[in-house]
Curated annotation (Swiss-Prot):
Protein name as catalogued: Putative Bro-N domain-containing protein 069L
Domain Bro-N: 20-139
InterPro entries per the UniProt record, alphabetical: BRO_N_domain (IPR003497)
Domain of life, source organism: Viruses
């Protein structure tokens, strides 16, 4: 099977040993990974899928975000096959995901700009997402990025043990989307203090869940903040 999705190629091929390989070529980012099971009921290698979706710590993501009933191990899958060679203990512990497990990872990813990857997975394997997979953070940070394409920005900018939703490098402005109001206010204050001390930056926060939220107002505020000295 091969499909064109927004000029991106998604292929699923049979291998010589009767297995499957999923091959994605998306804007120069390629995933070529083996799949267990059958075409109707594929089982995915979790680490590869998590990395593909932008998780920096795939093992942690698999443990934290995927319910036990939606994942298994390579050794358990191979137990059901009579014609396979045994694998090492460590190899057998590799985490595999059912379709539902892949869906859970998609719902949890917060990386901006990976919509093509998500669409490719959904289309190729007919994944059922009953909720909108794009978070408010992804939606609104993505809108800001489209306005400021001429500026040097980094999403999920790492500062020691912290990450900033969006950072304007040349202006030292940190933009934070306080989705759900960032409930732990004391923890957020400490986090902000430590980041400011490290970078000497200015923080700009917005809450997409506030009653009068307007993304155009946020963009206007950022224009005034970034270019106040011009």
């Amino acid at each position: 099977m091969s499909d064109k999705i927004d000029n991106q190629i998604v292929k699923v091929e049979n291998t010589n040993n009767g297995g499957l390989r999923a091959i994605f070529n998306l804007d120069g980012v390629t995933l070529d990974t083996p799949i267990m099971g059958t075409w109707d009921k594929p089982v995915f290698f979790g680490k590869e899928i998590a990395e593909f979706l932008g998780f920096k710590k795939p093992k942690d993501a698999l443990q934290k975000h995927v319910k036990p009933k939606y994942k298994t191990t390579l050794s358990k899958v191979l137990e059901k096959k009579l014609d396979t060679e045994p694998v090492s203990y460590n190899e057998g512990k590799r985490v595999l995901l059912y379709k539902e497990g892949v869906v859970e990872l998609i719902k949890k990813t917060r990386l901006v700009g990976i919509e093509n990857k998500i669409d490719a997975l959904i289309e190729a394997f007919e994944l059922n997402l009953n909720v909108v997979h794009q978070t408010k953070e992804q939606e609104h940070i993505g809108a800001i990025l489209k306005v400021f394409t001429h500026e040097r920005t980094v999403t999920q900018y790492k500062v020691k043990n912290y990450k900033i939703d969006l950072y304007f490098l040349d202006y030292k402005v940190a933009v934070e989307c306080d989705e759900f109001g960032h409930r732990d206010r004391n923890g957020e204050s400490e986090r902000e203090y430590n980041i400011i001390r490290e970078l000497g930056c200015t923080f700009y926060r917005f809450n997409p869940d506030s009653k009068n939220f307007c993304i155009y107002q946020i963009i206007g505020d950022l224009v005034r903040l970034l270019y106040k000295d011009h």
